[in-house]
């Protein structure tokens, strides 16, 4: 038997020794998520990402992240049944600049509108905005009782349903086709499209609870940083007013950030 040290035993140390536990959060950084200038509250939250290591760049991990935010949080409002999807398109410093990616109604709102003794009318249409975004809009509306109606049901005839659906599609196409994405989002915030449909269909059959219930982003044009900065009120004068109001809040957030970095 050869005399000497058993290298395997000394190399590995004690068998079954505990590994040193590394806190995964020590390798991560917090980034602020910024909403476009269309919304009143710009600073919507923070997101976590692993720090840049070698070829793995932190900003690449952030781009394409989708955040779903209630409209009440974006507008500092009480009405909270609309949810907006915002997608990160660029990272500037510690800020993730987002753009509109979709809209939806909350499940409880949708369920509260569906009732007996009325007709539910749905329509959807694919439309392209003037700046090249292809959107799919879904609309929903419900028939209601006419004034002085005694009968408890208010069902529309199939012919009327088809007419109303045609009107819905016409109005949605018209409102989106003639505007860019920023103007479309400005219409979705108060849901002026739903109100227009309600007025237009009054002559066919009285409607209530008419909403654009969902907006899907199907296709986007090539990414341009200038346009994104304009959306965030960096290049346009119109966005400056809302940008300045929340500017103070953003500075406070940035002032709070450095101590965390020093500790890391």
Curated annotation (Swiss-Prot):
The keyword Acetylation applies. The modification ADP-ribosyltyrosine is found at residue 155. The modification N6-acetyllysine is found at residues 34, 56, 249. The modification Phosphotyrosine is found at residue 256. GO terms for molecular function: mRNA 5'-UTR binding; mRNA binding; structural constituent of ribosome; translation initiation factor binding. Residues 242-255 have a biased composition (Basic and acidic residues). One of its GO terms (cellular component) is synapse. Signal peptide: none annotated. There is a cross-link at residues 34, 249 (Glycyl lysine isopeptide (Lys-Gly) (interchain with G-Cter in SUMO2)). It holds the Pfam family Ribosomal_S3Ae. It is found in: Cytoplasm; Nucleus; Nucleus, Nucleolus. Keywords: Acetylation, ADP-ribosylation, Cytoplasm, Differentiation, Isopeptide bond, Nucleus, Phosphoprotein, Ribonucleoprotein, Ribosomal protein, Ubl conjugation. Residues 232-264 are annotated as: Disordered. One of its GO terms (biological process) is negative regulation of apoptotic process. The protein designated S3b has the same amino acid sequence as S3a except that it lacks the C-terminal 12 residues. It is probable that S3a is converted by proteolysis, either physiologically or fortuitously, to S3b. The modification Phosphoserine is found at residues 237, 263. Component of the small ribosomal subunit. Mature ribosomes consist of a small (40S) and a large (60S) subunit. The 40S subunit contains about 33 different proteins and 1 molecule of RNA (18S). The 60S subunit contains about 49 different proteins and 3 molecules of RNA (28S, 5.8S and 5S). Identified in a IGF2BP1-dependent mRNP granule complex containing untranslated mRNAs. Binds with high affinity to IPO4. Interacts with DDIT3. Part of the small subunit (SSU) processome, composed of more than 70 proteins and the RNA chaperone small nucleolar RNA (snoRNA) U3. Component of the small ribosomal subunit. The ribosome is a large ribonucleoprotein complex responsible for the synthesis of proteins in the cell. Part of the small subunit (SSU) processome, first precursor of the small eukaryotic ribosomal subunit. During the assembly of the SSU processome in the nucleolus, many ribosome biogenesis factors, an RNA chaperone and ribosomal proteins associate with the nascent pre-rRNA and work in concert to generate RNA folding, modifications, rearrangements and cleavage as well as targeted degradation of pre-ribosomal RNA by the RNA exosome. Belongs to the eukaryotic ribosomal protein eS1 family. This is Small ribosomal subunit protein eS1. It comes from Rattus norvegicus.
């Amino acid at each position: 038997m050869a005399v000497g040290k058993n290298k395997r035993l000394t190399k590995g140390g004690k068998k079954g020794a505990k590994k040193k536990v590394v806190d995964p959060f020590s390798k991560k950084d917090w980034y602020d998520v910024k909403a476009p200038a269309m919304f009143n509250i710009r600073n919507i939250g923070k997101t976590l990402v692993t720090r840049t290591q070698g070829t793995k760049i932190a900003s690449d991990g952030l781009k394409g992240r989708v955040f779903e935010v209630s409209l009440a949080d974006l507008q500092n409002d009480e009405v909270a049944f609309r949810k907006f999807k915002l997608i990160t398109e660029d990272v500037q410093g510690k800020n993730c600049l987002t753009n509109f990616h979709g809209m939806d109604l909350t499940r409880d709102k949708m369920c509260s509108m569906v009732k007996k003794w009325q007709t539910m009318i749905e329509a959807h249409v694919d439309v392209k905005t003037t700046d090249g975004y292809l959107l799919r809009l879904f609309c929903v509306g419900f028939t209601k009782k006419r004034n002085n109606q005694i009968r408890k049901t208010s069902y529309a005839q199939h012919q009327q349903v088809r007419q109303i659906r045609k009107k819905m599609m016409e109005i949605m196409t018209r409102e989106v086709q003639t505007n860019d994405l920023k103007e479309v989002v400005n219409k979705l915030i108060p849901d002026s499209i739903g109100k227009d449909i309600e007025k237009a269909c009054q002559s066919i059959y009285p409607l209530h609870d008419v909403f654009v219930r969902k907006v899907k982003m199907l296709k986007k044009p090539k990414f341009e940083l200038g346009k994104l900065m304009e959306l965030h009120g960096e290049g346009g004068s119109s966005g400056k007013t809302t940008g300045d109001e929340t500017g103070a809040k953003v500075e406070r957030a940035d002032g709070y950030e450095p101590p965390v970095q020093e500790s890391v």
